[in-house]
């Protein structure tokens, strides 16, 4: 996963953007104050695989364990040293796809372009929802695993702890908007599903297609917005 990168700190960028906006349109109403305890982080989640302990041993040998290579933003989660090859219909392949740990039910998360490359019609799903999803073949150095289901395009989502849920006045399963300001690509992404958990830090996950489309690496501002139903819907 790759985060927004800048030679300036997030607070510096937000301060400059607010100053410009205040001159042009008056003081904007931010979704969360800049001094919020838990800052908003937006990361790109590249294609990856989750594996059960059983599948780790099949693919990498008896007694094999996932070995952390790089720790991720969420505490306790990591990109492992191990990679696998994904094989789709008609023998289309994606080599060296990173495994993420720790172990959990086996699942493959792809971007839309990845699924096209593999020839797999992967539905957009919340992670863990494998109902009526396609499968694939995973190839490791010591063995092969055929997944009957579990290949998805991960729905863009935001991880929130209890204080974040309270601050944004949302609950797990709600959907939010993410506004990204970047030169030539300023965009608002809808349907960012909220995933609440007591142990997580505030973080939005987008896939590589979404991150590239909004030019996330050059973004100067990101903001989570709670959508409000049109007043006409109440009648």
Language-model-derived ranges and their functions:
Residues 41-43, 48-89, 95-141, 146-179, ...:
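Short beta-strand-centered segments at strand-helix junctions
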Residues 29-33, 137-142, 187, 230:
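Short amphipathic alpha-helical segments, especially helix-boundary/capping motifs
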Residues 1-38:
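Protein-protein interaction and targeting regions used for scaffolding, dimerization, and localization
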Residues 224-226:
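Conserved active-site motif detector
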Residues 6-9, 35-38, 67, 104, ...:
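Serine/threonine-rich low-complexity intrinsically disordered regions
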Residues 95, 184-192, 229-235:
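Short, Lys/Arg- and Gly-enriched loop/turn segments at beta-strand edges
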């Amino acid at each position: 996963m790759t985060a927004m990168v800048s030679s300036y700190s997030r607070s510096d960028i937000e301060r400059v953007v607010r100053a410009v906006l205040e001159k042009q349109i008056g003081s904007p109403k931010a979704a969360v104050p800049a001094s919020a305890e838990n800052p908003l982080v937006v990361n790109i989640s590249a294609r990856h695989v989750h594996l059960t302990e059983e599948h780790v041993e099949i693919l990498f040998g008896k007694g094999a364990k996932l070995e952390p290579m790089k720790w991720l933003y969420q505490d306790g989660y990591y990109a492992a040293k191990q990679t696998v090859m994904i094989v789709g219909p008609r023998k289309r392949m994606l080599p060296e796809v990173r495994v993420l740990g720790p172990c959990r039910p086996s699942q493959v998360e792809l971007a839309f372009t990845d699924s096209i490359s593999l020839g797999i019609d992967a539905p957009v799903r919340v992670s863990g929802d494998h109902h009526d999803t396609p499968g694939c073949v995973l190839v490791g150095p010591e063995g092969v695993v055929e997944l009957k289901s579990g290949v998805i395009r991960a729905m863009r989502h935001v991880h929130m702890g209890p204080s974040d849920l309270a601050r944004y006045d949302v609950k797990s399963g709600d959907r939010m908007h993410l506004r990204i300001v970047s030169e030539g690509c300023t965009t608002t992404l809808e349907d960012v599903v909220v995933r609440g958990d007591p142990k997580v830090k505030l973080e939005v996950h987008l896939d590589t297609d979404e991150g590239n489309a909004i030019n996330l690496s050059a973004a100067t501002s990101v903001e989570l917005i709670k959508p409000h139903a049109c007043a006409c819907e109440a009648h």
